[in-house]
Design a protein with these regions (language model features):
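N-terminal secretory signal peptides
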Residues: 1-13, 24-27, 38-40
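C-terminal segment of N-terminal export signals and the immediately downstream linker at the start
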Residues: 32-76
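A short C-terminal boundary segment appended to hydrolase-like catalytic domains
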Residues: 47-54, 408, 433, 440-467
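N-terminal active-site segment of His-dependent metallophosphoesterases
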Residues: 66-71, 78-83, 90-96, 105-113, ...
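Extended active-site neighborhood of metal-dependent phosphoesterases/phosphodiesterases
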Residues: 75, 141-170, 224-338, 364-374, ...
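Aromatic sugar-binding surface patches on proteins
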Residues: 119-128
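Short, flexible loop/turn segments at beta-strand junctions in immunoglobulin-like
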Residues: 131-135
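Active-site glycine-centered loops adjacent to acidic/histidine catalytic or metal-binding residues
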Residues: 187, 214-215, 251-252, 348, ...
Length: 467
């Protein structure tokens, strides 16, 4: 006879068996004493098939890891009389130097590392080198040397690949002895077809200085976009920038995008030594000589008020324009600028309304969405008294995507030329003959400044005039 304890154990055993059996039957869709069980999941899950964990993407800062390094064509930037910036694209982690000399044989050549003092920077997308101590109006030959890091797990295990020596190019520094012409393009907006038309023209005509007068970009959300636009554009004539010194003038679109504040990583600003300590932050303004011409760069900034909700409290352009006025006042009194026979100022947004504007030629309107608003008027009010006193004869602008030439008028003794944009005879899907990409050239002939507007879409001269 079983003890009470044994009877309880048997009951517990039978109860557990019933539960487990019922669960198994339910899993198999069988009928139990409690009736047919349907759609009941078993508490005992079937083993899941083994799935290998996803591999993390390779960290580009760990090295190229056997992938061949692609090296782009160099781009001359921030041209000056005694310095030159050189930037080029790379497809992976690399270091770079520039070798240069005042002769094509590279006799007594100089090698310059990227960066300044201390540790030379390395990068996965762009290398930047600044040549300093150059002679004004002098021709130099140069080439890039780029070396990939095949592995960079840490400083003790880093490995270098074979150096890649670039093609030899040449450039001439700015200065009074450089008798080259200037060329201006604007509002390219990353539109490659019209950009190629301008690049091809520049490559064939070889100006002494290119002014890229704003709106090179649209909205820049990452570094790759900036590298493509400034260093590695997908056009046949991209190598024009390797031998034509360029100075960049910011447009309103060149301030848009979550990444754009880091543009210095792709586009070299002016050297700190080229501006006094009072204007340390004015890294895009410049005043240089190109023969008998003084070339001055000003930044009109964004095309909306600082308080506009689209800026989310980030805009600080109104104080920026005032600071530039103080800089301009000093720049135009520098002996090499003041003594220039012709003084040309470049800015993106026009400082004066179009002739068909209802307020032309007085520009008294404060806000005009059709042509320009008070931000441009603000620049005019701040800068024009200085420009008039200094004898500025020509302002070259963009922004409007339509070529025009404004003659001098009372209170404004300078001509204003506005370059065309990227449109090819169309505007918002409709034919518009006034929309065409331009290259604006300026050259001194027989003691006169000759300005020519080239329509590179129809391969014609839109206008030529003399000052």
């Amino acid at each position: 006879m079983r003890s009470a304890h044994e009877v309880l154990d048997m009951k517990e055993f039978n109860r557990r068996g019933f539960i487990l059996g019922g669960a198994a039957a339910a899993a198999a869709g069988c009928t139990t004493a409690g009736g047919k069980v349907e759609n009941v999941s078993s508490p005992v899950q079937a083993a899941k098939p083994f799935v290998e964990p996803k591999q993390k993407p390779l960290d580009p800062y760990k090295g190229t890891r056997g992938v061949p390094l692609k090296v782009g064509t160099p781009c001359l930037q921030s041209a000056a009389s005694t310095s030159m910036g050189i930037s080029w694209s790379v497809s992976g982690l690399a270091k770079g130097v520039v070798e240069y000399a005042d002769n094509p044989q590279f006799l007594n050549s100089v090698t310059v590392k990227s960066g300044g003092f201390g540790l030379a920077p390395i990068d996965i997308s762009a290398i930047q080198v600044r040549l300093t101590g150059l002679k004004p109006a002098t021709r130099y030959w140069y080439r890039t040397v780029t070396t990939p890091f095949t592995d960079y797990s840490n400083i003790y295990n880093a490995k270098l690949g074979e150096p890649i020596v670039g093609k030899t190019y040449s450039f001439s520094t700015l200065g009074e002895g450089n008798r080259g012409k200037f060329a201006m393009i604007c509002d390219t907006h990353g539109q490659w077809k019209s950009y190629e038309m301008r690049a091809k023209f520049l490559k064939e005509n070889k100006p002494g200085l290119l002014l890229w007068n704003g709106d090179a970009t649209n909205t820049t959300q990452d570094k790759a976009t900036a590298v493509e636009i400034f260093l590695d554009p997908p056009i046949p004539s991209a190598d024009f920038a390797a031998e034509i010194p360029m100075s960049f003038v910011s447009g309103n679109h060149d301030y848009r995008g979550s990444w754009i504040s880091k543009i210095n990583e792709v586009l070299l600003p002016r050297l700190p030594s080229e501006r006094s300590s009072d204007f340390w932050d004015l890294k895009w303004n410049f005043a240089e000589r190109l023969g008998d011409m003084a070339i001055i760069g000003m930044d009109t900034g964004e095309d909306k008020p600082d308080a506009h909700p689209k800026w989310f409290g980030l805009a600080n352009f109104e104080p920026y324009r005032k600071a530039q006025a103080k800089w301009l006042e000093q720049a135009v009194t520098r002996p090499e600028i003041a003594s220039a026979k012709f003084k040309v100022l470049f800015c993106h947004i026009p400082l004066y309304a179009a002739p068909d504007h209802p307020d032309y030629p007085h520009d008294g309107v404060k806000v005009d969405p059709q042509d320009y608003a008070y931000w441009s008027r603000e620049c005019f009010d701040l800068w024009n008294p200085i420009m008039e006193k200094a004898g500025i004869q020509l302002v070259v602008a963009g922004h409007k995507h339509r070529y025009r030439h404004d003659l001098p008028s009372p209170g404004r003794r300078w001509h204003q030329v506005v370059g065309g944009g990227h449109e090819l005879g169309m505007s918002r899907g409709k034919p518009d003959a006034g929309r065409f990409p331009t290259v604006i050239e300026g050259v001194i002939k027989d003691g006169r400044l000759v300005v020519t507007a080239h329509d590179v879409f129809k391969n014609r001269i839109a206008e030529t005039f003399m000052i």
